[in-house]
Amino acid sequence: MSQDFSFTPFPDLETKRLWLRQATQEDTEAVFAVFSDPKVTRFHDLDTFTHLDEAIGVIERWVRSFENGRRIRWGIARKQDNYLIGSCGFRWDEEVNAAVVGYELASEFWRQGIMSEALHAILQYGFGRRGMQFVIAEIMLENVASRSLLEKLGFQSRGVLKERGFWKGEHHDLEQFKLTRSEFTAV
């Protein structure tokens, strides 16, 4: 069953410490700060940003992708000052009523439970309000922290996909994880 994921307005979400909201051009410097850190882009398919224009372009793509119903990308902002410290979101697969999840967080906020909190909120949204059947995540094999995060959220490894990704001039083996609606509600 196919589901229409084109929707408006943008669904803002709230957690104990975070606002999950649409990024705007006012967030350009914050987005640049995240993606100009080589520690953040090490496992990412984007090159490390060197110009503010790259952040402007990413925000524009996030907005366009939401407007055409293909993807949704939430900016992760601290409640205390609404400052954007990362992002997370889904790329919809309407054919199977599912999504692929992606995420990144400014390195100074790693290992504080922030991404776990943000992903839990968007998974609740995806499974509860959008009726998704499952979510897929694909990570580089060396990304131990991401593997730990996914396992904590209940994702199960489905194995390694050889040369699944190609970026930064080379092929990458990726480990694929899957979380079904029933597995998420059981966690």
Regions found by a protein language model. Give the residues of each.
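Acyl-donor (CoA/ACP) binding surface of acyl/acetyltransferases
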Residues: 1-41, 73, 77-187
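A generic secondary-structure signal
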Residues: 61-65, 125
